[in-house]
Design a protein with these regions (language model features):
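N-terminal Sec-pathway targeting helices
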Residues: 18-36
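N-terminal Lys/Arg-rich, disordered targeting/topogenic segments
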Residues: 1-23
């Protein structure tokens, strides 16, 4: 009887040790999940702010100086289009509309802001290509705008090959 009782006690001790090992693993997993959630909350807070505004004229003047050219009619518009598109891609957190993981999927305001910027960029690039790049009624279009405008109309949710960001950068 004592042997059976001793065996039962040993079995109970082994089971308790097994449960404690599982409890340690469970605690570790819970700690990892909590840390991950805290990191994503902090990143979400940092990424949810809109980028700084910029002076359109000052931006055009700086770029004209860097390129060593005299700005012509339409230069400021073109440079601003490029700057707005670059700002959308290079802001804090990058381009979030096609994110599949946290915290990107939690942030709905910034992807909506990005979509608004994208609509403006698409509309202006199309207007530049179709209307402004043609001299009066000539059928020839600017070659760079012929390439850029379709790139900026790429699917805004694509995250695989090719990524949305890479297609937009090619358009810029």
């Amino acid at each position: 009887m004592r042997e059976k009782l001793g065996d039962s006690v040993e079995i109970m001790k082994e089971r308790l040790e097994d449960m404690n090992m599982g409890s340690g693993l469970r605690r570790l997993l819970i700690a990892i999940v909590i840390i991950y959630c805290l990191i994503t909350l902090v990143l979400g807070y940092l990424w949810s702010s809109e980028p700084e505004s910029f002076s359109v004229q000052q931006n055009a003047n700086v770029l004209a100086e860097e390129l060593g050219i005299e700005p012509v009619i339409g230069f400021t518009t073109s440079v601003t289009l490029m700057k707005v598109a670059e700002t959308m891609l290079d802001k804090s957190g990058g381009y979030l509309s096609n994110d599949l993981l946290l915290p990107g999927i939690w942030l709905d305001n910034i992807p909506n802001w990005e979509y608004g910027v994208l609509v403006q960029v698409r509309d202006l690039s199309r207007a530049l290509r179709k209307d402004f790049s043609r001299s009066q009624s000539q059928s020839t279009q600017d070659k760079d705008l012929e390439i850029a405008e379709p790139q900026l109309h790429f699917d805004n949710d694509s995250w695989a090959v090719p990524s949305t960001e890479s297609e937009y950068r090619r358009g810029i």
